[in-house]
Regions:
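Short amphipathic beta-strand and strand-loop transition segments with alternating hydrophobic
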Residues: 55-58, 135-142, 198-200
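Long terminal segments
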Residues: 244-249
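A short, amphipathic edge element
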Residues: 18, 49-51, 126-139, 189-194
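N-terminal mature ectodomain segment of secretory-pathway/periplasmic proteins
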Residues: 15-100
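Boundary of Sec targeting at the N-terminus
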Residues: 11-13
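Bacterial N-terminal signal peptides
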Residues: 1-6
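Gly/Pro-enriched, hydrophobic low-complexity segments
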Residues: 83-85, 93-96, 103-107, 112-129, ...
Length: 249
């Protein structure tokens, strides 16, 4: 009993893994916000190209968040727009407008794990995860970095195919509940992508925005970096911004 009792007490004090993931998600969703984004894609050989993006987001009741993303530069992607409806407890919805085709189409579930505009980020990385799509468990507590280390596994094969990985390991700060790193494993259980959070922008409502993050593809040695600038929170955003019609303007 000497060893068992302390272990039981530690387990009782440890928050449920799904609750930690849910809290981390909720802290990253603010009332309204606009910003510019630089997306830089670096090839294995060192050459790089950048995309300039504008983003406006607004949150609603029950964890619903809507986001409009518009590509400004370079010329070959200018006018491309995305509408993201980020649901907390149900499937996210995404649409993309392609100016060359003058057509808006819905990004279907099977495309969620595919590349976001040829970067190392996936379409799913552009949304907050639906907590119920995964089972979550603690792997260990890292005393050195003061982190929760949580493994998230898709609840079934369909969800695994949808997200494009067999499991994800998240490193979350214990004191602030902020995700600091994510590791993604393929269907052969091999680590193939790492996303690291480089900096956080604190918001006035006690929440936060991931200001700078980098995705490294271990298979291709490509790297993609997202950096936010000109961040304005609490902006007045009309609901008409988040419509198919606005995508095509």
């Amino acid at each position: 009993m000497g060893l068992i009792l302390p272990l039981l007490q530690a387990a009782a004090q440890q928050p449920d893994a799904a609750q930690i993931m849910s809290k981390s998600r909720d802290l990253s969703i603010t009332g309204s916000l606009s910003a510019n984004i630089s997306l830089t894609i670096t090839e294995k050989g060192g050459s790089s190209r950048s995309r300039t993006i504008s983003m406006t987001t607004k949150s609603y009741a029950d964890g619903l968040e809507k986001r409009i993303i518009k590509f400004i530069e370079p010329a070959d992607v200018r006018g491309t727009s995305m509408l993201v409806v980020d649901n907390k407890n149900s499937a996210d919805e995404m649409w993309i407008y392609l100016p060359a085709l003058k057509k808006t189409r819905r990004i279907v579930t099977s495309e969620k794990g595919k590349s976001f505009m040829s970067s190392e980020f996936s379409n799913a990385d552009m949304t907050s995860p639906t907590i119920s799509d995964f089972t979550h468990k603690h792997l260990e507590k890292s005393g050195t970095n003061n982190q929760w280390i949580i493994e998230s596994t898709p609840v079934n094969e369909d969800k695994a195919e949808e997200y494009g990985y067999s499991r994800k390991i998240s490193y979350i700060s214990i004191d602030k509940s902020q995700v600091q790193k994510m590791e993604f494993y393929n269907f052969d259980n091999e680590l193939f992508k790492i996303i690291e959070i480089k900096s956080i922008f604190p918001l006035s409502d006690g929440k936060y925005l991931v200001k700078n993050m980098v995705a490294n593809n271990l298979n291709t040695n490509r790297k993609s970096e997202i950096l936010f600038s000109n961040i304005s929170e609490g902006v007045k955003v009309d609901d008409s911004n988040f419509t198919i019609q606005n995508l095509e303007r």
